[in-house]
């Protein structure tokens, strides 16, 4: 697969030998999710030092939430295949509903959030990493919905802490975790080989929001902007049946399809993912924040032609 000559023409980074990196992984789906485990294994096999600091359980759509002033507990994965995987929990007050303590206030063990997991990782699990990768998320994080994304916001925390970060999301129905991991690992290798003039993996203060289309439809790679467009939007509804048949007639927060994109959305990441492109959208820790697009385009374009489209051989 090839990208356009225009994308391949620009570029200022110089190829360098690849080195083993210290990489912190996190997600918003829990430390046992197949995607993060596959990425851990792929990066380790490529020679990198990799550690996981993730929520205990699914924390999708938690955005930038975190619980402050509460005691936390850190656990370690008991699967010997993932000896460097850690998770975070805390407690919350709630009403007991069992017969033995009905109506009483009790402490309920709950998962830490994605932001909390990255903060833990940067402080205790792998201080001063070369790179933070959050994901791969099962479901794309696109456009305006990034503001609610635990994946995106956790990566933003890393960028704000001075660490280059990738927020990685795949198609919701994509089940090929090893292939997703191989593509991300290949991108990491490209970042390492095409460092910036100062030796950094990415321009200072910049992260990348990476979204993958269904892999069987992958057409190429595209440098995009996060933008505002997203094919669906959140709303309150009196009937959640369209989201889950078991919730028919029940009220709650669901989704509705958005109108088609217009000319103003032409370079938005959601538009290009829908066309079958792997998208790389630079961000500086805030959704839609302005960035020097020309400078970033020149710095990142080599990755599109030389890294993300040619998958590593098995």
Predicted features, each with a name:
Residues 10, 15-17:
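N-terminal signal peptide c-region/cleavage motif recognized by signal peptidases
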Residues 23, 34-37, 41-117, 128:
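A cross-family phosphate/adenosyl-ligand binding-site feature
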């Amino acid at each position: 697969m090839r990208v356009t000559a225009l994308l391949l023409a620009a570029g200022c980074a110089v190829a360098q030998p690849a080195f083993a990196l210290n990489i912190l992984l996190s997600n918003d789906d829990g430390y046992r999710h197949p995607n993060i485990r596959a990425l851990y294994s792929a990066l380790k096999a490529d020679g990198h030092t990799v550690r996981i600091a993730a929520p205990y359980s699914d924390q999708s759509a938690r955005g930038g939430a975190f619980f402050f002033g509460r005691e936390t507990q850190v656990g370690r994965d008991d699967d010997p295949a993932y000896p460097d995987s850690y998770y975070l929990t805390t407690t919350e007050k709630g009403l007991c509903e069992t017969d033995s303590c009905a109506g009483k206030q009790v402490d309920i063990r709950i998962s830490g959030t994605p932001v909390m997991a990255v903060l833990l990782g940067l402080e205790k699990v792998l201080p001063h990493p070369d790179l933070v990768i959050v994901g791969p998320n099962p479901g794309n994080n696109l456009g305006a919905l990034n503001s609610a994304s635990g994946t995106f916001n956790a990566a933003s925390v890393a960028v704000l802490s001075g660490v280059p970060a990738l927020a990685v999301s795949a198609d919701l129905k994509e089940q090929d975790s090893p292939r997703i991991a191989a593509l991300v690992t290949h991108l990491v290798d490209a970042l390492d080989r095409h460092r910036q003039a100062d030796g950094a993996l990415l321009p200072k203060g910049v992260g990348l929001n990476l979204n993958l289309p269904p892999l069987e439809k992958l057409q190429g790679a595209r440098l995009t902007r996060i933008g505002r467009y997203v094919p669906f939007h959140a709303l309150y509804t009196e009937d959640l049946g369209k989201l889950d048949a078991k919730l028919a007639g029940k009220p709650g927060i669901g989704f509705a399809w958005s109108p088609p994109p217009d000319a103003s959305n032409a370079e938005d990441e959601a538009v290009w993912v829908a066309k079958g492109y792997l998208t790389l959208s630079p961000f500086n820790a805030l959704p839609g924040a302005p960035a020097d697009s020309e400078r970033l385009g020149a710095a990142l374009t080599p990755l599109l032609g030389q890294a993300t489209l040619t998958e590593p051989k098995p």
